[in-house]
A protein has these predicted regions:
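Outer-membrane beta-barrel signature, preferentially recognizing the C-terminal barrel domain
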Residues: 1-36, 88-103, 110, 157-162, ...
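Extracellular loop and loop/strand-boundary signature of outer-membrane beta-barrel proteins
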Residues: 5-8, 89-94, 141-155, 197, ...
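Transmembrane beta-barrel domains of outer membrane proteins
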Residues: 11, 21-25, 96, 106-110, ...
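Transmembrane beta-barrel architecture of outer membranes
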Residues: 17, 163-165, 213-217, 266
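Repeated loop/turn-to-beta-strand initiation elements of outer-membrane beta-barrel proteins
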Residues: 28-33, 115-118, 174-178, 226-231, ...
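Gram-negative outer-membrane beta-barrel transporters
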Residues: 36-193, 270-274
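C-terminal beta-signal and adjacent terminal beta-strands/loops
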Residues: 43-45, 128-131, 182-195, 221-280
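Generic long, charged, amphipathic alpha-helical segments
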Residues: 179-184, 191-216
């Protein structure tokens, strides 16, 4: 069990952000194609985050430091941390910082083909680094751990090295269109399998790992100017979210609803009306 929540004593974060971007639009070679590549490098000082419940337990056992052990509250009698009132205090505070870097890629292609228009789009993100500095170094550790490609009690939400969305669509000149979208989330390992002394124990526990996840969505549309109708199915193959034991991911409720699709197949219908403005 964890006691989580905000902290009114937390101070503002400070960040240094560096970005470099490149846009390609080779209209003379491939008309209708546009691609953008952006590199980012962000360093946050005094970051508002948590030390992590598992890190707190690990470092208490390794160092015996009151800085960690004072946050471990075992249940009376049983000394448990998951029943009878036992918990680890894991509220937010200003830690040493967070460093992250990666590359975002977007591309699109639009062109009239046959009796309509073809459209392709792609959005991908490569996470090169995501490092958390707890600001608490010990005799055995430097207080920093890397979360790229991991999830769990310390790294929390899955941070796959690669994720993307791709869409293929075609719209006829008379207004009917169809598109299919694919969503991909790369595989992540349980953070306690890490050999980083600040993070994991190096345990061989593949049961906590999450394999790559893929979802597909289908949308049909019809343009009845000024009304546009849309009928679609998200997660058309009714793929269930990856299930992990609750103790492998902190307070995630056996999956990560903020990352994966927790609902399954769902159908939607929408209508939009476009208003025109008259110039007087």
């Amino acid at each position: 069990n964890q006691f989580i929540g905000g902290n009114p004593d937390a101070e503002p974060e400070k960040a240094d952000t560096y970005t470099v971007g490149l846009v390609l639009e080779p209209d003379a070679i491939v008309p209708g194609f546009v691609m953008a590549v952006d590199y980012y490098d962000i360093s946050i000082e005094n970051a508002i985050s948590t030390i992590g419940a598992q890190t707190t337990i690990n470092q208490c056992g390794i160092t015996g430091d009151a800085l960690f052990c004072d946050n471990v509250n075992r249940a009376p009698g049983s000394l448990a941390l998951w029943v009878n009132g036992g918990f680890v205090n894991n509220t937010t505070l200003n830690i040493g910082g967070v460093e992250t870097s990666g590359v975002d890629i977007t591309a699109s292609y639009n062109r009239s083909i046959g009796a309509g228009r073809l459209s392709l789009s792609f959005n991908g993100s490569w996470l090169n680094d995501f490092t958390i500095d707890t600001g608490i170094a010990t005799a055995n550790t430097d207080g920093r751990y890397h979360c790229t490609g991991l999830h769990g009690n310390n790294c929390c939400t899955p941070l796959p090295e690669w994720r993307h969305q791709a869409r293929l669509g075609y719209t006829f000149d008379f207004g009917f269109g169809a598109s299919i979208r694919g969503r991909h989330f790369g595989a992540v390992d349980w953070d306690q399998t890490s050999t980083d002394d600040d993070l994991g124990t190096g345990a061989d526990a593949s049961v906590g790992d999450i394999s790559a996840q893929n979802y597909f969505d289908l949308t049909l549309s019809y343009d009845l100017d000024p009304v546009n109708l849309r009928l679609g199915v998200n997660n058309i193959f009714d793929k269930e979210p990856p299930i992990i034991a609750s103790n492998y991911g902190g307070s995630n409720g056996n999956t990560y609803v903020e990352t994966y699709d927790p609902v399954g197949r769902r159908i939607f219908l929408s209508a939009s009306l476009q208003f025109y403005t008259l110039a007087l």
